[in-house]
């Protein structure tokens, strides 16, 4: 999120790209990609494709910066099918400071943006039958959201099951999902591994041993997805599914498993280049290009009602010695299944 924000700088007048400027951008792009892109063979294929386009003079007539960035992105993705990879144009001067180390002002603006959106924690409630629902539309750094997540955990602590709605979640920071995941385990658990090609290193990610607020480790967990669910929430769903900790309900996700960071290409161009790859310690692979396959595949619009019914069945199966509660659950399931059969949805 923060790494992709437009850099601060001095605004310049618009100008037409020259042949030299286009060549500078391409040279820097291919150099960074060939050294750091997470899949070396694919990096070579992309570099070859770009050089062939360049040799055929297909970029020569492009003098608009935004169009040049768009064309390069399309040509890269035509080979890689990696939607984390792309080139952006900035009308403002791009500082030559390290782009993965944002300035204090960048950080201030980023945090303020998050505060105005409640750091994307958008909805929390208890559905009929005592099923908790938490909608998260993006992941900010854990240090920003600790109080929000602890408050959400407290709100959900007396529910009998939890549904996480990621249908409109398009990504975010790595430690944001890890904080939320940590509430659903009793002990430290190995969640994922991340291989960094640029450093030739692998980092393990484990749930946190202690989290503020109550644990949700005893709750059945359901995760809602859509075709638009992408990147960080996909990793959350994929890893929890692989560990057998959650059932995924909804649509196959977007398929973006590669972590990215910004690279300065020139005074007005920036590339987002995936440099690492997260894999599950259970499957030893990821969901890049294929998405997370739901346990129960339904249209996104039907996912909440479907998960609600599944959660109630799970609660009913555990209910003993309380005829009144059992009858309540059976009636609620009957009503919701009738709604489902008639084409109704839950919003």
What is each of the regions a protein language model found here?
Residues 29, 76, 134, 164, ...:
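Terminal peptide-recognition signature
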């Amino acid at each position: 999120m923060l790494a992709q924000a437009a850099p601060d700088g001095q605004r310049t007048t618009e100008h037409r790209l020259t042949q030299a400027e286009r060549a500078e951008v391409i040279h820097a792009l291919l150099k960074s990609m060939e050294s750091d892109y997470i899949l070396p063979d694919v990096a070579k294929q992309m570099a070859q494709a770009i050089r062939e386009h360049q040799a055929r003079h297909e970029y020569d007539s492009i003098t608009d910066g935004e169009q040049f960035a768009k064309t390069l992105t399309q040509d890269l993705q035509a080979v890689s099918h990696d939607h984390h990879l792309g080139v952006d144009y900035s009308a403002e001067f791009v500082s030559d400071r390290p782009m993965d180390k944002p300035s204090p002002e960048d950080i201030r603006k980023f945090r303020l943006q998050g505060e105005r959106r409640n750091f994307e924690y958008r909805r929390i409630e208890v559905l009929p039958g005592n099923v908790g629902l938490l909608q998260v539309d993006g992941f900010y750094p854990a240090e920003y959201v600790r109080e929000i997540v602890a408050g959400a955990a407290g709100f959900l602590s007396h529910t009998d099951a939890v549904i996480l709605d990621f249908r409109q979640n398009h990504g975010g920071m790595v430690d944001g999902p890890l904080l939320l995941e940590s509430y659903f385990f009793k002990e430290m658990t190995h969640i994922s591994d991340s291989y960094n090609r640029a450093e030739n290193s692998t980092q393990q990610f484990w749930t946190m041993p202690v989290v503020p607020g109550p644990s949700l480790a005893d709750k059945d967990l359901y995760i809602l997805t859509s075709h638009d669910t992408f990147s960080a929430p996909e990793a959350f769903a994929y890893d929890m599914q692989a560990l057998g900790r959650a059932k995924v309900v909804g649509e196959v996700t977007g398929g973006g498993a590669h972590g990215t960071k910004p690279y300065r290409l020139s005074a007005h161009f920036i590339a987002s280049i995936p440099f690492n790859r997260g894999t599950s310690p259970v499957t030893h692979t990821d969901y890049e290009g294929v998405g997370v396959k739901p346990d129960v595949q339904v249209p996104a619009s039907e996912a909440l009602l479907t998960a609600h019914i599944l959660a109630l069945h799970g609660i009913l199966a555990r209910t003993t010695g309380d005829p009144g509660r059992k009858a309540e659950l059976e009636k609620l399931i009957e009503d919701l299944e009738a709604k489902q059969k008639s084409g109704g949805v839950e919003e």
